[in-house]
A protein has these predicted regions:
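Short coil/turn connectors at secondary-structure junctions
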Residues: 2-7, 35-38, 71-74, 104-108, ...
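N-terminal phosphate-binding or glycine-rich loops at protein starts, especially the Walker A/P-loop
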Residues: 2-54
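Short glycine-rich or small-residue beta-strand-to-loop segments that form or flank ligand, phosphate
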Residues: 6-16, 76-81, 107-113, 185-190
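Short, ordered loop/turn segments at secondary-structure junctions
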Residues: 12-14, 43-48, 81-82, 114-115, ...
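Short glycine/serine/threonine-rich phosphate/pyrophosphate-binding segments
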Residues: 16-26, 50-51, 92-95, 115-123, ...
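Glycine-rich oxoanion-binding loops at beta->alpha junctions
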Residues: 53-107, 116-117, 144, 155-156, ...
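Accessory alpha-helical/coil subdomains and C-terminal extensions
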Residues: 100, 111-113, 121-123, 127-134, ...
Length: 225
């Protein structure tokens, strides 16, 4: 019989309204498969928690506490903006991760984040196998930008899309009420980097006679138009 292994879960990058719901899903599902997965450790402040061996034993939390994560905003275990360098630039960081995983009998690595987190999962999987301690590295998608490949609607995007749609609607009402003597243009800058999904959400507002101009990063801006 294969040895039962523990799991490690970490949150990465900017938190969203639903990242804790993903954490809840990982922990609750692991608890349903106690024959295969032992404890679920969470990294305090993301992947840094693994590098510093600062782990939270979620098995000490009640079922009610874990279930409450579904409706808890922000990042319950702490997140970080810490990008692991490439294997060539700093192999030691990856080796340190695997050392900690080995010390705590961790065979499953759940990394909740964006594209960089997916890349980290791939590298950890490759190196751990080369080191003779193969780890199942699973990327749990999370990004408000909605820019992950082969992902139609990423967890986190729906919440921010609603927020931007409501904010655009409220701003347009402000402009309409003040346009006679004051503000005639209201500029809203949103996140998204090279993807225009969040910007596009501003177009979800109802047609109330106020023009909404949306500029997408995918389309070159022509000032003459």
């Amino acid at each position: 019989m294969a040895k039962k292994m523990n799991a490690f879960y970490a949150q990465s990058g900017g938190v969203t309204a639903v990242i804790n719901a993903s954490a809840c899903g990982v922990i609750e599902t692991a608890r349903k498969h106690k024959d295969k997965i032992g404890k679920v450790y969470a990294g305090r402040n993301g992947i840094i928690g693994a590098l510093t061996e600062d782990l939270i034993d979620t098995s000490k939390e009640s079922a009610a506490a874990i279930a409450a994560l579904r409706s808890t905003p922000s990042g319950a275990f702490g997140s970080c903006r810490f990008k692991l360098k490439s294997l060539e630039a700093n192999k030691r960081e990856y080796e340190r991760l695997i050392e900690v995983f080995k010390a705590h009998n961790i065979g499953y690595f759940f990394y909740n984040g964006g594209g960089d987190s997916a890349d980290t999962c791939f590298k950890v999987s490759q190196l751990s196998e080369a080191m003779g301690y193969p780890i199942q590295a699973i990327h749990v998608p999370k990004t408000v930008d909605n820019d992950l490949p082969i992902t139609d609607c990423c967890p986190g995007f729906g919440s921010v899309a609603k927020y931007i749609a409501v904010s655009t609607l409220e701003a347009s009402y402000d402009v309409r009420s003040m346009a006679k003597t004051s503000t005639k243009v209201f500029v809203i800058e949103v996140m998204g980097r090279h993807a225009g999904w969040i910007a596009a959400a501003g177009g979800l507002v109802e047609d109330h006679g106020i023009p909404v101009v949306i500029l997408f990063p995918e389309i070159e801006f022509d000032q003459k138009k």
